[in-house]
Amino acid sequence: MDVKRVKQILSSSNRIDVTYEGVPVWIESCDEQSGVAQVYDVSNPGESVHVNVTALEEK
């Protein structure tokens, strides 16, 4: 995935399924400069991680 698509997903009112290393995640935010997104595991929303947007996959 790229930063442009992450931004589109963030601004969308639709639910768009995204995974990180095969795990379903919600995208919380994206830093366009660094290409890093803050994501939460759908099954464990209490913990977030920062990942490179290229590691995210749209399902």
Curated annotation (Swiss-Prot):
Location in or out of the cell: Spore core
Domain of life, per lineage: Bacteria
GO CC annotation terms, alphabetical: endospore-forming forespore
Keywords from the UniProt entry: Sporulation
Inducing factors: Expressed only in the forespore compartment of sporulating cells.
Listed GO biological process terms: asexual sporulation; sporulation resulting in formation of a cellular spore
Main location: other
Family: Belongs to the SspH family.
Designated name of the protein: Small, acid-soluble spore protein H
Organism: Bacillus cereus (strain ZK / E33L)
